[in-house]
Every structure is written in structure tokens, then in C-alpha cells.
Amino acid sequence: LLINMLAAYYDINNADRFKELFGEQWIYEHPTSLRAKFMILRFNFSAVNSTPGKLEESFEEHCTGRLVEFADKYEHLFQPGFRQELMSRTTASTRLDYINSTASRLRLRIYLLIDEYDNFTNTILSTFGKDEYRKATHGEGFFRYFFNVLKFLTSGNGMALERMFITGVSPITLDDVTSGFNIRTNI
């Protein structure tokens, strides 16, 4: 519910619907300067298959699906051919980088929402053990690399990815994949 509310509040596509969405709420009378200023990119990693051998492909498919939804929802803010160019990239990380660099050039803002960031890693740890868990979250593991890309995409002035809200159950995965991810605050 919180992630849905954040998405509705910050989504640039909801600028004309603020009263409809929040008219009876305290926030309607006390809006922040950032309301309806972001394109919203959402992931829910509970949809990722945690079975070894299927994990990375499932992660890529989930991310690609969400990136396509993002492109469809906000294509009107980008140049013609944006979606096609996005799909010419081969991985979730390169697609995310393309979205960020293109949005940055256009001075658009992105708010990234990740629900259950640790769902599949907790399942791996409890079901398949530490070795399988480490493959995804340590060294050159794909999930660790994904968080390295997120950090990179927030580094520097004028980057479109300005905000992230990430939920999970356990700090274990966050500690393992976010070494050096000093752009976060636990709440």
C-alpha cells in the first residue's frame, strides 16, 4: 500500500489527478514541491523465480517486463523511437542505463521503487544454501552488479535517477549487495 501511495503521489502522469487521488487526505492540503515530478519505475522481486539455473533469467525477464511497462507509460516524454532503442539493449542493466542517460539529457526525473528486494535471495538462502546465495550476491554476482549499476546511476550531477525506495524483510541481502552503496538510509 505504501509503495502504491508513493507511486501515485510522485508520478508525473498524475499531475492532473492530484485532487482525485488525494483530495480527502492531509497531504492534499500540504503538498511537497516534488509531488507529480517523477517518472516511476517499479520492481517487485517476489516475482523472480529463485530456482538455481532459472534465477538470473527470471530476474532479467522480470526487469525487462517492468522496463517495457515504464517505456510504454512514459514514451510520450521521450523522443520518437525511445521504446525500440530501449529494447535493442540486451540486459536489464544496460536498459536501465539507457533510460537513465536519456532521461538525464531531457532533464526528466526517475523515482525507483523496489518491493521485496530480498524475496528471492531469502528463498535461495533458506532452500538452496549459502553457495547458491553467494553466486548471486557476492563478487561478480548479477544481483550485486544490479545494485552497483543503481549506485552508478545516482552518481553525478543531473542524473535522472534521483530517488529510490526499497523494501525488504531482512538486512542480510542489502548488506551483501550494497557494499559501498552509501546512498541509502535505513528507516
Where are these regions (language model features)?
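Phosphate-binding site recognition
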Residues: 1-187
